[in-house]
Amino acid sequence: MAKGKDVRIPVLLECTACVRNGVNKESTGISRYITQKNRHNTPNRLELLKFCPYCYKHTIHGEIKK
C-alpha cells in the first residue's frame, strides 16, 4: 500500500567544530545526534545548532552519511 520510499528518514548529525579542530586534546570524542528529516521539505543537508558536550558549547551539527 505504501507508495515509493519513506518520506521521513533517520539522519546522523555530527559536530562540525570537533571535526574541524581534529578533536581538542582534552576532549574524548565527537558529538553525534540522531534525528529525522522529511526528504520532500529538506532535500539538501540538514544543519542544526545543538549542544556539544566535548566543546562545552552550542555548535553547528551537520548531517553525515551512514
From Swiss-Prot:
Keywords: Chloroplast, Plastid, Ribonucleoprotein, Ribosomal protein. One of its GO terms (biological process) is translation. It comes from the Eukaryota. GO terms for cellular component: chloroplast; ribonucleoprotein complex; ribosome. The keyword RNA-binding does not apply. The keyword Translocase does not apply. One of its GO terms (molecular function) is structural constituent of ribosome. It is found in: Plastid, Chloroplast. Belongs to the bacterial ribosomal protein bL33 family. PANTHER family: 50S RIBOSOMAL PROTEIN L33, CHLOROPLASTIC, LARGE RIBOSOMAL SUBUNIT PROTEIN BL33C. This is Large ribosomal subunit protein bL33c. It comes from Guizotia abyssinica. The lineage of its organism: Eukaryota, Viridiplantae, Streptophyta, Embryophyta, Tracheophyta.
